[in-house]
Amino acid sequence: MKHTLSVLVEDEAGVLTRIAGLFARRGFNIESLAVGSAEQGDVSRITMVVPGDENTIEQLTKQLYKLVNVIKVQDITETPCVERELMLVKVSANAPNRAEVIELAQVFRARIVDISEDTVTIEVVGDPGKMVAILQMLAKFGIKEVARTGKIALVRESGVNTEYLKSLESKF
């Protein structure tokens, strides 16, 4: 199972290197990694997606806490949270199919950020499922390049379960 970990760290040089080293020494893979400033100026939030069972993630969490600059580690996999990812995708789009590519981007509430004679570059923001869905739809046109930020997430203070909300949407 894939787990989403939110790690607060002191914003100092070498912190990310130590965390990556910990994963490498233990043979763990990081599938997604996003780092940025947190709510306090001297603290950064690292959001990572890692595969593993409950015992593995518990062991990994304990190991992370042993690192000097780690403030807090939270497995937010089962916690209601807001998840987002940013993706840029460059798609083949010549004159005959350009309108269809642009229309598809609009359906996904994506933005066209560049157009050339042969390509359209699309900016997509949303949950990881949206990224997969639009890539599947764009594949028939020919995907030239993809750049993704990796997932970022914050716990929902409301405690509302997003999956529950999605199930309600499908009923209306």
Swiss-Prot record:
SUPFAM superfamilies: ACT-like (SSF55021)
Enzyme Commission number(s) from the entry: 2.2.1.6
UniProt keywords, alphabetically: Amino-acid biosynthesis, Branched-chain amino acid biosynthesis, Transferase
Protein name (database record): Acetolactate synthase small subunit
Boundaries of every ACT domain copy: 4-78
Family: Belongs to the acetolactate synthase small subunit family.
Enzyme class: transferase
Designated gene of the protein: ilvH
PROSITE patterns per the UniProt record, alphabetical: ACT (PS51671)
A GO cellular component annotation in the UniProt record: cytosol
Naturally occurring in which organism (per UniProt): Synechocystis sp. (strain ATCC 27184 / PCC 6803 / Kazusa)
Domain of life: Bacteria
Pathway(s) it belongs to: Amino-acid biosynthesis; L-isoleucine biosynthesis; L-isoleucine from 2-oxobutanoate: step 1/4; Amino-acid biosynthesis; L-valine biosynthesis; L-valine from pyruvate: step 1/4
